[in-house]
Amino acid sequence: NATRTPDFDDSWNLIDPHSKLVVKTVSARALWVKILQNRMETGEPYLMFEDAVNNDLPDFQKRKGLKVHHSNLCSEITLATDEERTAVCCLSSVNLEYYDEWKDHGSFIPDLIRMLDNVLTYFIDNAPSQLERAKFSAQRERSVGLGAMGFHAYLQKNDIPFESGLAGGINMEMFSHIKYNADQTTRYLAIEKGACPDDDTASVRNRSEER
């Protein structure tokens, strides 16, 4: 491995994203070690691999030449940005501790997706001119995100070991249930209210629910 040889030059330029000028040159290896050490000690920073994220962009955004350049600070949002677009977080979460109470309610996930879509509409209609790029992004892709919390509490409540095969199976069941219902809802909303303008196939209302 050439990167392990003593004479390998691992100089890494730190570039100001606005001026595009190199502001400092550091050792890539030393920087990576610092990142990993801090991650182990504090749980931060969250790491995002740009190539992997862009490979997973919806095809209709790839066709427009859009790219993800960064995430939000918590790394749960990976949306395309450029000179016209500023990413907008429109999020909600389900509480998995009570999964058994809501999983059989057919309108539970659909109502949440519809609520998030309504929040986007309110933002688009009422955002001030200073947020024009955020408004444009929200209007074009209508991205929403439905996350989850409380998985550990569900396992504790039901005396299920965290690293057990049963826990893994339950995890798969929960998130498959959420994704299926969310995907179905955004496709239904595309028929009812119209697809997001970015989607040239006119199949989805909300970009984040399409993969």
What is the meaning of each model-derived region?
Residues 39-138, 150-154:
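Function-dense linear segments that define catalytic or interfacial modules
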Residues 25, 29, 85, 106, ...:
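Electropositive phosphate-/nucleotide-binding environments in soluble metabolic enzymes
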Residues 28-35, 40, 50-74, 188-209:
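Conserved mixed alpha/beta core segments that line enzyme active sites in large multi-domain catalysts
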Residues 20-25, 97-106, 130-131, 155-173:
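Inter-helical turn/loop segments and adjacent helix faces that build the functional surface
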Residues 111-135, 158-209:
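Internal maturation/activation junctions in enzymes
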Residues 34, 150-154, 170:
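A general alpha-helix detector
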Residues 1-42:
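Polar, glycine-rich mid-to-C-terminal structural blocks
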